[in-house]
C-alpha cells in the first residue's frame, strides 16, 4: 500500500470514527456531470417536485444541501446512487417562477463524506461527516503549487487557442489550498477525474493529481492546435474533389 492509499484509509477511518457531535444530516442533491468544489458557483433549475420540496425546506430553515456526483442511476425519476464524497452548497440567490419551478444559485462551502443514506423522505438525505482537506500549509504543498503554476498558465493559453476564445487569468493565488481548488474547478476534464480530485485527502495529493492531469491535457491541446491547420487544409480538398465538413 502506497502513502496515498494509507492516507485515504486513515481519512476513511476518521470519518467512520467521527464523534456524534461532528455529524450532521444533509438533504442530498445527486447530479449527473457536476462535481462541486468549495468556492465553486453552481446555478440550478429546480423543477422536480421532490427537489422543490427540498430547496424550499433549505430556504425556510437556512440549511445547506449536499451536492454529490451520481455513481449509478439518473437525476430524474428513481433515486440515484451517489458517490460517497460531496460538497455542501449554500443558497445565495433564488428566482421563483410562476409554475412553481425555481432558478437558484448556490456556492460550494465544505467537503463531506456520506456515512449513511436515508430515503424516508421524497428526496435523499444522508448522515455525513465533515471531510476537511489537510496539509495546505506544508512545504510539500508549496513545492507542488510551484510546479502546477506554469502548467496552469500554459493550459489557459493553449485552451484559448484551441477554443478560439480569449481566456485570461489575472493572477494565480499564492495559497496552495486556494490554487488547488481553483485548478480543480477550472480543469476541463471528465467527471471521473473531477471526482478523484474532490476525494483527495490533502492539498499535496490534489496538486499532484492536477499536475499529472495538466501534463496530459497540455499534450492533447498542443496536438489539437498543431494539427488544426492541417485538418482545415484537408477539409478543403484539392480542386475537383468534395470533402465532407
Residue ranges, per PLM feature:
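N-terminal low-complexity, acidic/polar interaction/targeting segments
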Residues: 2-245
Amino acid at each position: 500500500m502506497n502513502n496515498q492509499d494509507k492516507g485515504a484509509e486513515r481519512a476513511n477511518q476518521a470519518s467512520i470514527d467521527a464523534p456524534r457531535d461532528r455529524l450532521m444530516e444533509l438533504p442530498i442533491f445527486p447530479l449527473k456531470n457536476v462535481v462541486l468544489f468549495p468556492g465553486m458557483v453552481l446555478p440550478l433549475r429546480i423543477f422536480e417536485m421532490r427537489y422543490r420540496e427540498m430547496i424550499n425546506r433549505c430556504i425556510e430553515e437556512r440549511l445547506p444541501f449536499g451536492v454529490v456526483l451520481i455513481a449509478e442511476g439518473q437525476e430524474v425519476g428513481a433515486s440515484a446512487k451517489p458517490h460517497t464524497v460531496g460538497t455542501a452548497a449554500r443558497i445565495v440567490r433564488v428566482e421563483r417562477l410562476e409554475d412553481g419551478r425555481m432558478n437558484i444559485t448556490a456556492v460550494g462551502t465544505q467537503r463531506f463524506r456520506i456515512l449513511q443514506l436515508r430515503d424516508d423522505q421524497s428526496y435523499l438525505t444522508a448522515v455525513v461527516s465533515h471531510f476537511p482537506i489537510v496539509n495546505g500549509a506544508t512545504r510539500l504543498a508549496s513545492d507542488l503549487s510551484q510546479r502546477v503554476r506554469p502548467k496552469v498558465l500554459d493550459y489557459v493559453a493553449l485552451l484559448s487557442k484551441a477554443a478560439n476564445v480569449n481566456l485570461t487569468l489575472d493572477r494565480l493565488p499564492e495559497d496552495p489550498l486556494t490554487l488547488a481548488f481553483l485548478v480543480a474547478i477550472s480543469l476541463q476534464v471528465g467527471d471521473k477525474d473531477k471526482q478523484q480530485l474532490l476525494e483527495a485527502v490533502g492539498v499535496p495529493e490534489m496538486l499532484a493529481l492536477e499536475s499529472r492531469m495538466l501534463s496530459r491535457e497540455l499534450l492533447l491541446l498542443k496536438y489539437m492546435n498543431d494539427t488544426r491547420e492541417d485538418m482545415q487544409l484537408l477539409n478543403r480538398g484539392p480542386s475537383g474533389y468534395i470533402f465532407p465538413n
